[in-house]
């Protein structure tokens, strides 16, 4: 810079406290360069302060200050990191600053005029300056929020000594100690007129709207016999489906109305209403401002009330004009054929509704069942419901299965706990006449594989199945082997008898069988005869759940072979036990000591030697626990 201070670092700073650099005049410009022959560091790192004692020392080296940029600073290259004020703020160097060119001014203009201040107020709590006169209109002034702070001054003559007004440079704007300089003007009093009940709060403004007087109508006494007019119920509205169908062999009746207490003659006493009557001409509205004329002397035009719906009933769909005096109000577009009418308009006949001219007798009867009916003829009612036989699980029945004595048992109706059905009791199943022997339990070897029973046919007479000799470790009781010979009626089944035993046949009525089965405790299992094909071989698994009982059967035969050579076997080796409850016998429950084991053989039509072993079965008439 030509006339400014050169900026460089590397020379010590000299200090001269005798000279003053307060006035940058041209007369001292030559001595200013000789005084500051060394350059002053103009850069000071922010955040660090240099003590004054170090700055006054003549041989202080400022080596830790960052260097300035290489090029000289101008008005366009100014870095805020390099302040222009000397960090020491020495009294000798306080007017030294970096500039583009040192301005030469007159020494007479160096003195700055001090800012004028407010004159000290004689009283700090005075409200107004001294040169402002108080208006005579408001002699008393108080604080806006604290009126007790400012006492009123009665005489202001000796206080106002200065006549020339002075403009103050600074005036407080806040009114914390006193009110503002502007005099407080009270708002104008708004007179609220309380004479009218509903007066406007703005008396100077015009009313936006005025209440119009209503039409004068004579006051009518309320009628005690009629309720006020109510809208028709929704049930009277026919809607888009039209009116409801009529009763058979009857004319159209008016829609039902809510029953209201009233006299029989409704023409003389009508409900009084303030609303005007509807105009007789369609499409014209009555004039509400026209006064009504009394029509009490005019007789009614019609003596009978029309049977159609009232005129206030709105029909949203059937907007067709008809004759005014028809008793049956029907649109002219409704055709007589119900199917043609409901097809294109209402869709499905049963789903969407019925036409207006359809009687109830013409409608199809509602279906009671949605399931399709089979074309097979009606069969005889089955004696027992279709249900599965007893499932194959090993447990004891909690209820007696058959009644006691065995003579009262129905023939061909023996079932086991595993769901197998037997047509006859084996030899020794029935107890002998006399006192029943005590029950006993016999151990037995491991159970043998068991097969389901075959159908023994429906013929009443077939030979008694003889018994197969079996031995037990304890009893050593033997019996004859059991085979089934061919029946007279069914050539498929055959029974081969090796040892004949006395047998007993008991004929029972099917009705007695049904009554005996119905007397069993609930829940009983299905008991009956298995019907299978003649050549069908049943699997060795438990019986299938699709077994059914025959609807009718010939006279039942109860075949109970009785003999001395009864077979005694273990209950563990048996299929099931029959438990009976004594209903009529005084002897109580009976238990057979000779559970029987028998096998049934099926002979095919081609060969008669085919024998299939039957699973052993035991019959227990006592209440001893079953281990099977």
Curated annotation (Swiss-Prot):
Function: Acts as a suppressor of RNA-mediated gene silencing, also known as post-transcriptional gene silencing (PTGS), a mechanism of plant viral defense that limits the accumulation of viral RNAs.
Similarity comment: Belongs to the tymoviridae protein p69 family.
Biased composition (Polar residues): 320-331
Keyword Magnesium: no
Compositional bias per record (Pro residues), positions renumbered to this chain: 434-450
InterPro entries (alphabetical): 45/70kDa_tymovirus (IPR004935)
Positions with biased composition (Low complexity): 299-312
Disulfide bonds: none
GO biological process, one term: symbiont-mediated suppression of host innate immune response
Pfam families in alphabetical order: Tymo_45kd_70kd
Protein's name in the database: 69 kDa protein
Alphabetical UniProt keywords: Host-virus interaction, Inhibition of host innate immune response by virus, Suppressor of RNA silencing, Viral immunoevasion
Top-level lineage group: Viruses
Biological source species: Turnip yellow mosaic virus
Spans annotated as Disordered: 1-25, 141-332, 346-404, 418-493, 535-628
């Amino acid at each position: 810079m030509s006339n400014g201070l050169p900026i460089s670092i590397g020379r010590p700073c000299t200090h001269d406290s005798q000279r003053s650099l307060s006035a940058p005049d041209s007369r001292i410009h030559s001595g200013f360069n000789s005084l500051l022959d060394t350059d002053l560091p103009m850069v000071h790192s922010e955040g660090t302060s240099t003590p004054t004692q170090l700055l006054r020392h003549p041989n202080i080296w400022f080596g830790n200050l960052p260097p300035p940029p290489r090029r000289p600073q101008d008005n366009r290259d100014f870095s805020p990191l390099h302040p222009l004020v000397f960090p020491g703020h020495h009294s000798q160097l306080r007017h030294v600053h970096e500039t583009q060119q040192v301005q030469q001014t007159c020494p007479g203009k160096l003195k700055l005029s001090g800012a004028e201040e407010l004159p000290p107020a004689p009283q700090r709590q005075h409200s107004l300056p001294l040169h402002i006169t108080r208006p005579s209109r408001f002699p008393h002034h108080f604080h806006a929020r604290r009126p007790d702070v400012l006492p009123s001054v009665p005489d202001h003559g000796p206080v106002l000594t200065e006549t020339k007004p002075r403009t103050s440079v600074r005036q407080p704007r806040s009114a914390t100690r006193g009110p503002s300089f502007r005099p407080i003007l009270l708002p104008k009093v708004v007179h609220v007129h309380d004479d009218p009940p509903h007066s406007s709060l703005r008396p100077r403004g015009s009313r936006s709207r005025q209440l119009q007087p209503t039409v004068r109508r004579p006051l009518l006494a309320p009628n005690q016999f009629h309720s006020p007019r109510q809208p028709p119920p929704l049930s009277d509205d026919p809607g888009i489906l039209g009116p409801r169908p009529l009763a058979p062999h009857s004319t159209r009746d008016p829609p039902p109305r809510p029953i209201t207490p009233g006299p029989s003659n409704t023409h003389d006493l009508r409900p009084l209403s303030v609303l005007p009557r509807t105009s007789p001409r369609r499409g014209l509205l009555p004039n509400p401002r026209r006064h009504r004329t009394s029509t009490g002397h005019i007789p009614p035009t019609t003596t009978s009330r029309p049977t159609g719906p009232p005129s206030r009933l709105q029909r949203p769909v059937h907007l067709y004009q008809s004759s005014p005096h028809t008793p049956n109000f029907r649109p002219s577009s409704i055709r007589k054929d119900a199917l043609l009418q409901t097809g294109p308009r209402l869709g499905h006949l049963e789903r969407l509704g019925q036409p207006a001219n359809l009687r109830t007798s013409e409608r199809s009867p509602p279906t009671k069942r949605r399931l399709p009916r089979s074309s097979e003829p009606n069969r005889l009612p089955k004696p027992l419901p279709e249900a599965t036989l007893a499932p194959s699980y090993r447990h004891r029945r909690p209820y007696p299965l058959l009644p006691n004595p065995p003579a009262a048992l129905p023939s061909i109706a023996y079932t086991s706990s595993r769901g197998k059905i037997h047509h006859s009791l084996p030899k020794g199943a029935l107890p002998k006449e006399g006192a029943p022997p005590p029950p006993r339990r016999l151990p037995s070897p491991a159970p043998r594989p068991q097969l389901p029973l075959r159908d023994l046919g429906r013929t009443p007479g077939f030979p008694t199945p003889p018994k197969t000799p079996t031995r037990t470790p304890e009893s050593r009781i033997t019996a004859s082997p059991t085979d089934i010979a061919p029946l007279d009626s069914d050539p498929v089944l055959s029974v081969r008898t090796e040892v004949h035993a006395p047998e007993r046949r008991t004929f029972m009525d099917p009705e007695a069988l049904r009554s005996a089965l119905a007397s069993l405790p609930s829940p009983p299992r299905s008991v009956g005869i298995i019907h299978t094909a003649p050549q069908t071989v049943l699997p060795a698994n438990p019986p299938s759940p699709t077994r059914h009982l025959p609807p009718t059967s010939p006279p039942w035969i109860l075949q109970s072979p009785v003999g001395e050579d009864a077979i005694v076997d273990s209950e563990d080796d048996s299929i099931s036990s029959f438990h009976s409850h004594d209903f009529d016998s005084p002897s109580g429950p009976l238990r057979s000591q000779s559970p029987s084991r028998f096998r049934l053989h099926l002979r095919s039509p081609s060969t008669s030697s085919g024998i299939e072993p039957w699973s052993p079965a035991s019959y227990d008439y006592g209440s001893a626990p079953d281990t099977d």
